[in-house]
Amino acid sequence: MPPQRSRRRKRASATQLYQTCKASGTCPPDVIPKVEGTTLADKILQWGSLGVFFGGLGIGTGAGTGGRTGYVPLGTRPPVIAEPGPAVRPPIAVDTVGPSDPSIVSLLEESSVIDAGITVPDITSHGGFNITTSTGGPASTPAILDISPPTNTIRVTTTTSTNPLYIDPFTLQPPLPAEVNGRLLISTPTITPHSYEEIPMDTFVVSTDTTNTFTSTPIPGPRSSARLGLYSRATQQRPVTTSAFLTSPARLVTYDNPAYEGLTEDTLVFEHPSIHTAPDPDFMDIVALHRPMLSSKQGSVRVSRIGQRLSMQTRRGTRFGSRVHFFHDLSPITHSSETIELQPLSASSVSAASNINDGLFDIYVDTSDVNVTNTTSSIPMHGFATPRLSTTSFPTLPSMSTHSANTTIPFSFPATVHVGPDLSVVDHPWDSTPTSVMPQGNFVMVSGWDFILHPSYFWRRRRKPVPYFFADVRVAA
């Protein structure tokens, strides 16, 4: 292995060596002439400059600026620059002071009275007070002085400035109190009238479509119900068979404080130590048990709770865990195997001894304007002498037409009609005879309120799935 050569160290510059070795006198012979400018080249330049002058041409090692006067065209002279001279002060007037002049200078100027030669007019008074003087003893007449109270004049000045860049139609101006001689004067309007025109506004948004909304405040539409996702893939399913899940669910998670179980309708939060064991293995690492909810699933009433496990916790404090759906079925909803015979609500015929509407009577209108053909009924149309019972069989759908209404009643079985008691009906003549068209066939007139529509004629209702709901009518957190 060849030996390693030592690295070459850089020598200090001449300026650095000159600063350290000049005082001690140990400088190399080439350092002092180079720094002080006494080399052979420097001496040749000094000797040559004595005989030749190139200062005006700008020849040298400096920047090519043409010297102090700059570059000028050939055959011309450089411009003359006037140099400023010394400033000249204004002359100061000097007053001579003699020996007889006073040494005290007055700070106030002497005022002189100028007589312009204007005569002073005489002013003659036409009224006033008469002054009486006496030389001896007290005055016999007391002095009467007419003293009138001075007029109390109140002057209030208010200055108001308005910004032309901002005008508010409803600017509240607070009152400006002004107190003069113990009096408080307030006279300022509080609300200034506006100058704009009031235009009634109309509502143009009439739909509740929130997808194509062009305004900032759309009309709120129906709110969709929240989906809990109890049976999703990310939620574990754990059935609970013990009844303590309904009354005291905290006993299935922890042993702490068995005397206080908390409210079963609220969300339960648990704080576990680092090493613990749950009473029920299914409730291991549960840190939160949300509010109960009721639902209908597979023909039974089910009580459900969402639990949150704590599987991992980072140094920052972030917790990770899975969601568990704990449910307990209360009772199955099954159909009874016992068959109960149902009794009909109404009979097929109305008997004469029926007492459903004993206080109601059937009143028939006058049918003198009705064209009746092929009538096999024995119901009287005018006066009634005694109550009668008539039974009529109709093989088809009969109908009756009058000037007031058309009535069609389907009957395919013998009907017994109770005529009612004797009533006198007043006959009112008509101005014109109406024309009625009545189809061929039998008819029957029924008047009463004691009949019920058969259940088979009702519309069938579609069953909707039972949604999930909470015991306290709030969404679980």
From Swiss-Prot:
GO terms for molecular function: DNA binding; structural molecule activity. It is found in: Virion; Host nucleus; Host early endosome; Host Golgi apparatus. GO terms for biological process: microtubule-dependent intracellular transport of viral material towards nucleus; symbiont entry into host cell; viral penetration into host nucleus. InterPro entries: Late_L2. Disulfide bonds join 21-27. Its main location: virion. It comes from the Viruses. A motif (Nuclear localization signal) lies at residues 1-12, 459-466. GO terms for cellular component: host cell; host cell endosome; host cell Golgi apparatus; host cell nucleus; viral capsid. Keywords: Capsid protein, Cytoplasmic inwards viral transport, Disulfide bond, DNA-binding, Host endosome, Host Golgi apparatus, Host nucleus, Host-virus interaction, Late protein, Microtubular inwards viral transport, Phosphoprotein, Viral penetration into host nucleus, Virion, Virus entry into host cell. Highly phosphorylated. The keyword Kinase does not apply. The keyword Ribosomal protein does not apply. Belongs to the papillomaviridae L2 protein family. Interacts with major capsid protein L1. Interacts with E2; this interaction inhibits E2 transcriptional activity but not the DNA replication function E2. Interacts with host GADD45GIP1. Interacts with host HSPA8; this interaction is required for L2 nuclear translocation. Interacts with host importins KPNB2 and KPNB3. Forms a complex with importin alpha2-beta1 heterodimers via interaction with the importin alpha2 adapter. Interacts with host DYNLT1; this interaction is essential for virus intracellular transport during entry. HAMAP family: PPV_L2. Minor protein of the capsid that localizes along the inner surface of the virion, within the central cavities beneath the L1 pentamers. Plays a role in capsid stabilization through interaction with the major capsid protein L1. Once the virion enters the host cell, L2 escorts the genomic DNA into the nucleus by promoting escape from the endosomal compartments and traffic through the host Golgi network. This is Minor capsid protein L2. It comes from Human papillomavirus 42.
